[in-house]
Amino acid sequence: SRINVKLKSIDGTEINGQGPEIPEKKVKELMKQLSALGEGDVLFLAGSIPSSMADDAYQKIMEMLDGKGVRIVVDATRDLLMKVLPYHPFLIKPNNHELGEIFGVELKTRESVVPYAKQLQKKGAQNVLVSMAGEGAVLVAASGEVFEAPAPKGKLINGVGAGDSMVAGFMAGYMEKEDYLHAFHMGIAAGSASAFSENLATREEIASVYEQITK
């Protein structure tokens, strides 16, 4: 694996190590394991692809699983994200800056995010969840609904892992009720609760934020 160092501060600093060389044998073992996924399973593809692997690794994985009923979540940026859209990922989660970079625009408000999130949906994404830090979040759902919410009230302590927590919270909420609004609120609650705590949030902390945003 590799060692990543996160310096916890308001601005946040990350010192990320270079990933290891992954031999072809290990890549084949991974693909064999992933091929066993099926109906009802959820697969998260997040971050950059190791330099020793083909840059179309995500596409190959999604192509292999196409039609098997696996819900695939992709948390990646720019070209890596755009290349997987034809494979219809269940969820993608760019932030407003990443979304703006794709289209060459600056997106500062929730309202401005919506048309660009819809463009990603037209290109193949089923659900587009856009995080906006202090501005809140937007969900353009597969149902055709659009949900917006301001950021919950709380003191920002540690932003490390907040985005990952948001994605996990959304999927946990969706798997619980298969309701997009509930999933959206769970995503916001999990991401915000983690940002409000020294470490990843507890179930109780997430529940407290969820209650705040659903009153």
Which residue stretches match the model-derived regions?
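Conserved phosphate/ATP/ADP-binding segment of small-molecule kinases
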Residues: 55-143
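Conserved phosphate-binding/catalytic region of the ribokinase-like
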Residues: 63-64, 110-215
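Hydrophobic alpha-helical segments and helix pairs
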Residues: 21-62, 71
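Short, charged, surface-exposed secondary-structure boundary motifs
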Residues: 25, 101-107, 156-160
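Short beta-strands and strand-loop turn motifs
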Residues: 14-16, 40-48, 75, 93-98
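Conserved N-terminal subdomain of the carbohydrate kinase-like
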Residues: 1-41, 208-215
